[in-house]
């Protein structure tokens, strides 16, 4: 009771009162029905508890809404139900001032009442007190059937014999003390519809005996001529004396005259259900709107409980999607960062990095999407948690990448402020540059590390180096990807690991570092392919051994800056795959062992690129 604020008393009866209250938190009005238990018979107390139990289990759009119930100090049964602003039907008849209701409105009310009774009867519940004062109207003039104080749950034979109810609405079999069933409610409803149409009770007398005689003889005045014959026939069929020929609620709902109203009521109910459903996930048109990724960490609303569609699939399902609000885009950044961490935990190595040059997704039909632009290298078993770009529709060539600063870029990329690159934000940072599509997977200045197999020499011969330098003007080669195969392209990207402070002295260590930088042998003319087996324990052990040996050497020589760069990928909280640093160490180890085989003059021709 503490949750409700008392407003006024709106009704009073022989067993209790009805109070208008307001919920303190919801600010919504309800009706508090207080049924007095003190100084009442055992039957009355049992009926009060039965009403509280029955109404708490009912859920139907045309039955009063149940909110709460309790027993107050063992003196009152309190039932909180929905408030109907339109009052009851008896009040509506009085307010009509002799003006008859339209037949369409009466048919709508009749259909709603029949649906409510059909719900009760299908659950073996008899209302037993259907009358105009127990039929309530909402603000929208819809029906709510209430007051279940005399309701009864039927047994297996679906009949009862107790004489209860309001005499003017009692059926002949009840007055004759004959067991009755659900057809008694149909008789009472017929009396209500007659009263709503005629604006006077169907049966009225000065004494009880005269009333019983009228009911038994079914003596009623004809309905006004303004109502159609089928409607008057419906009311007459509900007032048949023999319950066996009296139609049920289901039979009446199938009557041809009521079919348009039945369909209209059902359509309104379906629309109401759609409005009350939980909101859907944001459409892809709102998710993929134009904006720039400029901040890595933002708080965005949750996508929903299921999240049955990934962000990449949303883009693929809606090729016409364009970017709009920054808040929606920040949600994507947050989501992709989660995917990157999840994928790296499964050992997935992503070997493609887009530079700060802008890229844009061009929209092509399904028939043209034949080349997959993502480049994913799996270490061990495949990760099912990585969300790939859909190959069946318009595909974005921007892939969640996780490169760290331990992977060097070229000078040109450095000049474009790649040093300030944020791995979480940058994956989709510049989605607006033109003329890039799945059919022309083109990447501007990408630093690619070709990983050689264990048995293959990773160094160039002098002839190969000269060929590489001559073909440096060739660019714009296509990118292909086949499991662990990487095909490199664009201009020759020399990557030199500058491990020596003094380069001008021409020491052997400087030559070795220059030669190690040439290990990324990307030739534009031949597009050389390199294969390796990431599941080979022998190769991994050898690479780790080389990493430890080279780290010890740097530590012994006091080259702490280079040691810091080498071991930085192994720090906590990193999302990039550590295999990159392992293979670099393997290259450095083999470089040291094969220094004598490298031509020093060729190594000096390689452009110097500082380690990022």
Swiss-Prot record:
Keyword Mitochondrion: no
Residues of the active site: 129
Biased composition (Low complexity): 514-527
Entry keyword annotation includes Thylakoid: no
Family the UniProt entry places it in: Belongs to the protein kinase superfamily. NEK Ser/Thr protein kinase family. NIMA subfamily.
Biological role stated in the UniProt entry: May be involved in plant development processes.
Protein name: Serine/threonine-protein kinase Nek1
Gene: NEK1
């Amino acid at each position: 009771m503490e949750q409700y604020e008392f407003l006024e008393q709106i009704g009073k009866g022989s067993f209790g009162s009805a109070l208008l209250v307001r919920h303190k938190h919801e600010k919504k009005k309800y009706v508090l029905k207080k049924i007095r238990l003190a100084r009442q018979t055992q039957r009355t107390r049992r009926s009060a508890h039965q009403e509280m139990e029955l109404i708490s289990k009912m859920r139907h759009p045309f039955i009063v809404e149940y909110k709460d119930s309790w027993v107050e100090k063992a003196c009152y049964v309190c039932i909180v139900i929905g408030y109907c602003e339109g009052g009851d039907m008896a009040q509506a008849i009085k307010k009509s001032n002799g003006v008859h209701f339209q037949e369409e409105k009466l048919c709508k009310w009749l259909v709603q009442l029949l649906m409510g009774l059909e719900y009760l009867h299908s659950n073996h519940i008899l209302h037993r007190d259907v009358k105009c004062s127990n039929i309530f109207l909402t603000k929208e003039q819809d029906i709510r059937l209430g007051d279940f104080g005399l309701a009864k749950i039927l047994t297996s034979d679906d009949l009862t014999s107790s004489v209860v109810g309001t005499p003017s609405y009692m059926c002949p079999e009840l007055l004759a003390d004959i067991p009755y069933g659900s057809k008694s409610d149909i008789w009472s409803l017929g009396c209500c519809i007659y009263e709503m149409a005629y604006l006077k009770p169907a049966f009225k007398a000065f004494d009880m005996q005269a009333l019983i005689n009228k009911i038994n003889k079914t003596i009623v005045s004809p309905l006004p001529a303004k109502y159609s014959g089928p409607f008057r026939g419906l009311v007459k069929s509900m007032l048949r004396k023999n319950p066996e020929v009296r139609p049920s609620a289901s039979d009446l709902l199938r009557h041809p005259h009521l079919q348009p109203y039945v369909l209209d009521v059902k359509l309104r109910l379906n629309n109401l259900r759609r409005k009350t459903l939980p909101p859907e996930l944001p459409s892809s048109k709102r998710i993929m709107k134009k904006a720039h990724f400029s901040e890595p960490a933002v708080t965005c609303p949750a996508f929903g409980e299921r999240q049955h569609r990934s962000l990449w699939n949303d883009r693929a399902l809606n090729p016409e999607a364009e970017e709009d609000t920054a808040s929606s885009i920040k949600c994507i950044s947050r989501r992709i960062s989660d995917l990157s961490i999840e994928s790296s935990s499964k050992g997935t190595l992503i070997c493609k990095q887009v530079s700060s040059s802008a890229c844009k997704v061009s929209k092509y039909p399904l028939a043209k999407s034949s080349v997959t632009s993502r480049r994913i290298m799996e270490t061990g078993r495949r990760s099912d948690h990585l969300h790939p770009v859909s190959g069946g529709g318009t595909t974005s060539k921007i892939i969640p990448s996780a490169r760290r600063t331990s992977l060097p870029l070229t000078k040109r990329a450095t000049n474009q402020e790649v040093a300030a690159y944020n791995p979480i934000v940058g994956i989709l940072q510049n989605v607006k540059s033109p003329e890039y599509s799945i059919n022309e997977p083109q990447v501007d200045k990408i630093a690619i590390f070709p990983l050689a197999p264990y048995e293959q020499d990773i160094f160039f011969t002098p002839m190969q180096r000269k060929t590489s330098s001559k073909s440096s003007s060739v660019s714009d080669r296509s990118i292909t990807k086949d499991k662990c195969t990487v095909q490199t392209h664009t201009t020759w990207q020399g990557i030199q690991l500058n491990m020596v402070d003094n380069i001008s002295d021409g020491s052997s260590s400087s030559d070795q570092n220059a030669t190690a930088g040439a290990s990324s042998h990307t030739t534009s003319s031949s597009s050389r392919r390199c294969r390796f087996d990431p599941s080979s324990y022998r190769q991994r052990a050898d690479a780790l051994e080389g990493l430890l040996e080279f780290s010890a050497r740097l530590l012994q020589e006091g080259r702490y800056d280079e040691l810091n760069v080498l071991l930085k990928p192994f720090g906590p909280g990193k999302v990039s795959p550590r295999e990159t640093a392992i293979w670099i160490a393997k290259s450095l180890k083999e470089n040291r062992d094969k220094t004598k085989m490298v031509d020093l003059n060729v190594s000096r021709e390689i452009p110097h690129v500082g380690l990022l």
